[in-house]
Design a protein with these regions (language model features):
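Catalytic palm active-site di-aspartate
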Residues: 6-7, 186
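Short hydrophobic/aromatic beta-strand or adjacent loop that forms the aromatic wall/cage
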Residues: 7, 135-137, 208-210
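A structural signal for short, well-ordered beta-strand segments
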Residues: 81-83, 138-140, 211-215
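Short hydrophobic-aromatic micro-motifs
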Residues: 9-10, 97, 140, 189-191
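Catalytic core of non-heme Fe(II) oxygenases with the double-stranded beta-helix
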Residues: 87-182, 222-227
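Non-heme Fe(II)-dependent double-stranded beta-helix
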Residues: 1-4, 11-118, 232
Length: 232
């Protein structure tokens, strides 16, 4: 299903104890607002989690899991982990899009590279689609995520179509419709970053906490290097 549809849900990848432990690690390491137990309301995500030992260990563990390992080439490395925490107080929607940027160590001038940017102190670039097609995102749900919790909505099979213009993306969604990716506690959503996806605001009183890992090839073309890379 991953190769044909661009995504697959993997129920029960993490146990309830795993989810509780990971949520506690996030609370321990990510900055809180004024020493309180709530992160700033305008801070929906934190991109640099791979610098923490617990996150590196989780990346290594994921690469060896029977449900994940067949989806990854043996030389794959974890290159990014972003934490998303959507609540009624810290809420957002994401319009239809593809994930086009990757985190790299330094800027390289090459005609194939575009869209240089800096996010949370890290350097990002948009490489050609042929590299993006090699990437795999794994989203770990630390909470149940139902329709009212702002889950991802995906347009199946659009990962095979390269980088799409906004007009083409909208036309594909209108023609094909969307799939709502609801998930139980501990479920993982594995997806290709070029898959068209969006999400709505949460209308529930429950948190929607997700650890979003990205895996890719160990070496990059065009003189690029990953900003971080974790090999199992």
């Amino acid at each position: 299903m991953l190769e044909t549809q661009g995504f697959v849900l993997l129920p029960g990848l993490l146990t309830p104890d795993d989810c509780a432990t990971l949520a506690a690690e996030v609370d321990k390491y990510l900055p809180l607002q004024d020493g309180n137990t709530a992160r700033p309301p305008n801070s929906g995500g934190q991109r640099n989690l791979l610098k923490y030992p617990w996150c590196k260990a989780l990346a290594e563990r994921l690469q060896g899991m029977p449900a994940i390992a067949p989806l990854l080439p043996t030389s794959s490395v974890a290159v990014q982990c972003t934490y998303f925490e959507k609540t009624r107080a810290r809420n957002w929607l994401v319009p239809l899009h593809q994930d086009l940027s990757i985190p790299v160590a330094e800027r390289v001038e090459h005609p194939a590279l575009r869209g240089w940017s800096e996010k949370d102190g890290a350097l990002f670039v948009q490489p050609p689609a042929r590299l993006l097609q090699e990437l795999l995102a794994v989203r770990l749900h630390l909470d149940p995520c139902q329709g009212e919790d702002g889950p991802l909505r995906v347009v199946p099979a659009t990962h095979q179509l390269g980088v799409l213009t906004p007009r083409n993306a909208q036309a594909l969604r209108d023609a094909s419709g969307e799939v709502l990716c609801v998930a139980d506690l501990g479920t993982a959503l594995a997806m290709r970053p070029l898959l068209l996806h969006a999400s709505s605001k949460s209308t529930s009183n429950r948190p929607r906490r997700v650890l979003h890992f990205v895996f890719g090839p160990a070496t990059l073309p065009w003189g690029l290097a990953w900003s971080k890379a974790v090999l199992s």
